[in-house]
């Protein structure tokens, strides 16, 4: 709690990330209750938060807090697959892609700033399709590549990067190309 108060007093503007190392919305209600309490404490101290989850509907329980603080809240989800069989194999504990997309749309409609993390890219065509499926209710895209997998060598990352930039630019979307993909 002391750290939170110090951050609040310092005028910190960068968002506190929930979470890039473990999902804040898991299948355990105790964790989800802790996540909600953490959000409440951070918002009570006027600290900006950015949520990244694969939790889908599980995350919607906190949309009331986020929508009450639209200037302090960002909600994002990781999207990798349009193919549900691949999604279930690679992301077995994550919510289905369609569910995550519905949660994104709901957040956006509540006035919450939304973003998508498109990574790792297993199939460039699926990633491009995900942009086309979500662009009407996503404010920002972060795009990375597949790393630490032999499959990465079979993808022409330069072509993919250029296609992503073209599509997002044509749609008028803000985006960030991660360093691992920028070099192509």
Language model regions located:
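Conserved AdoMet/S-adenosylmethionine-binding subsite of the radical SAM
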Residues: 2-168
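C-terminal accessory regions of radical SAM enzymes
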Residues: 166-184
């Amino acid at each position: 709690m002391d750290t939170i108060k110090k951050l609040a007093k310092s005028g910190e503007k960068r968002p506190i990330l929930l979470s890039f190392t473990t999902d804040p919305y898991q299948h355990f209600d105790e964790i989800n209750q802790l996540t909600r309490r953490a959000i409440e404490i951070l918002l009570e101290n006027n600290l900006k938060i950015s949520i990244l989850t694969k939790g889908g509907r599980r995350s919607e329980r906190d949309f009331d807090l986020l929508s009450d603080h639209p200037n302090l809240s960002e909600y994002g989800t990781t999207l990798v697959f349009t193919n549900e069989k691949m999604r279930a194999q690679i992301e077995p504990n994550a919510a289905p892609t369609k569910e995550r997309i519905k949660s994104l749309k709901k957040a956006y409609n509540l006035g919450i700033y939304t973003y998508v993390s498109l990574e790792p890219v297993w199939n460039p065509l699926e990633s491009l399709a995900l942009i086309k499926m979500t662009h009407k209710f996503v404010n920002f895209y972060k795009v990375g590549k597949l790393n630490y997998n032999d499959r990465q060598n079979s993808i022409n990352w330069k072509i993919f990067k250029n296609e992503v930039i073209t599509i997002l630019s044509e749609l008028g979307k803000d985006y960030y190309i991660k360093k691992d993909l920028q070099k192509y």
